[in-house]
Amino acid sequence: QYKPAIVRGNASEIIALAGLWGLEGEAADLSRVRGVDTTDTVDAARDAAVALARYTGGAVVVSGEVDLITDGTTVAKSHGGSPLMSKITGCGCSQGGVLAVYACAADPFTAAVCGTAVYNVAGTRAAAVADAPASFKVAFIDELYRATAQDIADNQLELEEA
């Protein structure tokens, strides 16, 4: 009866979830999850993400080197972040909290795009001043705090039809 406004996961998680909900047929069997890590690519999860977004009527975020965000009609790709983000336990999970904050103030797709952009901006800036996981984590939190609406607007974003 109640469907999520925003779903966020790595490529393998999104493919598996679409499979569990019967949206992608064999996709869940093809997904390669290793704990919370993924061996699937963001591009491989595109169809599953679009199907999930159409099913929920919300937005889906697939995190990766270039994040994919879709509402089932439009696909956005958000650039930025840092490879160090994958070295921080819970970094992907905490993105869910950031997305939830934005979801309180905007429609699901806009919230997902803005929340992902601010995450990528913070990751890029933190990587410029930190070169190891512990210092990166502190710098990342500081950069989330410092991010502005203009930073979100300046984040590199590609848009295409789903």
Regions found by a protein language model. Name each.
Residues T70, T74-G80, G115-D131, F136:
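Glycine-rich phosphate/pyrophosphate-binding loop at beta-loop-alpha junctions
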Residues G19-G22, T116, Y145:
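A generic structural signal for secondary-structure junctions
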